[in-house]
């Protein structure tokens, strides 16, 4: 059973503490892991020189400032609520993660906190993280609220996204990926429709950095197996080393899915998706890559998808080159503003 803690209008379920989490708590109830410390005041980054809050104290929110509006979503480890600041009426998404969770999820949360801090307010194509807290067994992350949901939500509503709007979406996502890859040396590792969020202003932003990886340089590689396997590149599915271009494969599949209205790799005789990982791996690794049907889409779109979905990583175009692709130049954001996408 869980007890409930009342904090400024938010009813937060407090999990029964398990022994595993105790290793990461100080005597004062501060959550610490690697170089971060998190408490009811916020996130602190610990270095050999100093320990300071990630944001100036006078600029910090507190959980007591926020009141719940409604639940946006729930998962096994927590929930996301729409919340309102009592004094400013600003709206946020509050992600709450219960810390009676397994080791893998804990590591993902800590990684997300670190990535959020690295990218804080520095790129308009990444969902902003305003503050993070730890209190009574729950990590709370205050995020920018994207009021139209994800591309996955849009597909459910519209079935397919028209090609001109996909050019605008691709342009914004590629700018976000270019920042992650070239400036922050981060591989997202989980680009998919549900992690690309959109708002009424027509902005598309990258979210969810729980499985992202920070590399030491623009030429470095990784070899760990994390992320949503259906969108993984062949080298990742095959257990080989991979780099930034693995995100390009995932983006290509995502955009093609938005265009078709279904996941491009379809199980034989099924429409509901993949239940067998090894069948999908066999198809992605050993068969020719999927492509945009030329009888349904423009040559520019087909070329763009082909530039992303290449089995050899070196054959995929970089974010910088894709931003110059004719498909992105063909449609203007002014003419096809995403606020008109219905």
Swiss-Prot record:
CDD domains: PKc_MAPKK_plant_like
GO molecular function, one term: protein tyrosine kinase activity
Pfam families reported in the protein's UniProt record: Pkinase (PF00069)
This protein's record includes keyword Zinc: no
Domain Protein kinase: 66-328
Source domain of life: Eukaryota
Keywords recorded for this protein, A-Z: ATP-binding, Kinase, Nucleotide-binding, Plant defense, Serine/threonine-protein kinase, Transferase
Protein EC: 2.7.12.2
UniProt record, GO biological process: defense response; response to chitin
Deletion phenotype: No change in chitin-induced cell wall modification compared to wild-type. Modest reduction in chitin-induced MPK phosphorylation. The levels of mRNAs of the defense-related PAL4 and CHS are induced similarly to wild-type.
Similarity comment text for this entry: Belongs to the protein kinase superfamily. STE Ser/Thr protein kinase family. MAP kinase kinase subfamily.
Name of the protein this chain belongs to: Mitogen-activated protein kinase kinase 1b
Organism for this UniProt entry: Physcomitrium patens (Spreading-leaved earth moss)
Lineage of the organism: Eukaryota, Viridiplantae, Streptophyta, Embryophyta, Bryophyta
């Amino acid at each position: 059973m869980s007890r409930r803690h009342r904090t400024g209008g938010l009813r937060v379920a407090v999990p029964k503490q398990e022994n595993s989490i105790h290793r990461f708590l100080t005597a004062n109830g501060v959550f610490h892991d690697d170089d971060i410390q998190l408490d009811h005041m916020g996130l602190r980054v610990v270095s050999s020189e100093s320990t300071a809050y990630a944001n100036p104290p006078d600029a910090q929110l507190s959980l007591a400032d926020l009141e719940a509006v409604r639940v946006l979503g729930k998962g096994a480890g927590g929930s996301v609520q729409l919340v309102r600041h009592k004094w400013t009426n600003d709206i946020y998404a509050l992600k709450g993660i219960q810390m009676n969770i397994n080791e893998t999820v804990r590591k993902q949360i800590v990684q997300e906190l670190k990535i959020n801090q690295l990218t804080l307010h520095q790129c308009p194509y990444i969902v902003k993280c305003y503050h993070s807290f730890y209190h009574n067994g729950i990590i709370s992350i205050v995020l920018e609220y994207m009021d139209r949901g994800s591309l996955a939500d849009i597909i459910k509503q519209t079935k397919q996204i028209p090609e001109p709007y996909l050019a605008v979406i691709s342009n914004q996502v590629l700018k976000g990926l270019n920042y992650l890859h070239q400036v922050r040396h981060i591989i997202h590792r989980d680009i998919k429709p549900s992690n690309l969020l959109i708002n009424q202003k027509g902005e598309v932003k990258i979210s969810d950095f729980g499985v992202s990886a920070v590399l030491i340089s623009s030429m470095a590689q990784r070899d760990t197996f994390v992320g949503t396997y259906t969108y993984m590149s062949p080298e990742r599915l095959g257990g080989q080393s991979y780099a930034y271009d693995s995100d390009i494969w995932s983006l290509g599949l995502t955009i093609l899915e938005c265009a078709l209205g279904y996941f491009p790799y379809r199980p034989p005789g099924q429409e509901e998706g993949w239940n067998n990982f090894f069948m999908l791996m066999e198809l992605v690794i050993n068969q020719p890559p999927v492509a945009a049907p030329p009888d349904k889409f423009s040559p520019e779109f087909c070329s763009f998808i082909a530039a992303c979905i290449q089995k050899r990583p070196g054959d995929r175009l970089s974010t910088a080159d894709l931003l110059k692709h004719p498909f992105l130049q063909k449609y203007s954001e002014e003419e096809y503003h995403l606020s008109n996408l219905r």
